[in-house]
Amino acid sequence: MSRRNTDAITIHSILDWIEDNLESPLSLEKVSERSGYSKWHLQRMFKKETGHSLGQYIRSRKMTEIAQKLKESNEPILYLAERYGFESQQTLTRTFKNYFDVPPHKYRMTNMQGESRFLHPLNHYNS
């Protein structure tokens, strides 16, 4: 099996694992430990295979999931912060506002559409 195929299989496996673990804190250290590669090497492989940086991919996937939950449910923002591994509601609010340009409570209460910034799981397109 070629190096390229091995890298693609590794990244595909990591993408699956990230999706299964979006509701927990996902640090680069934790993901690289899972992969068996150094942080530096994993980030380089991930960028090469997906076109996304690993940290940005994880952040974007979490923000997409949270935005969808805000529209689909009445779950408290504090609960979503805890559920998706943020240190506090304030940390989630700051991250969400930086990503969508509005805080979560305003996003939920308006008809704002954030879909243009949604990042759906890459494995659904690459499989």
Swiss-Prot record:
InterPro entries documented for this protein:
Homeodomain-like_sf, HTH_AraC, HTH_AraC-typ_CS, MarA-like
List all membrane-crossing ranges: none
Induction context: By various antibiotics or by sodium salicylate.
Keywords of the record: Activator, Antibiotic resistance, DNA-binding, Repeat, Transcription, Transcription regulation
Q: Which GO terms describe its biological process?
A: negative regulation of DNA-templated transcription; positive regulation of DNA-templated transcription; regulation of DNA-templated transcription; response to antibiotic
Keyword Transcription set for record:
yes
Q: Does the keyword Transcription apply?
A: yes
The protein depicted here goes by the name Multiple antibiotic resistance protein MarA
> Which species is this UniProt entry from?
Escherichia coli (strain K12)
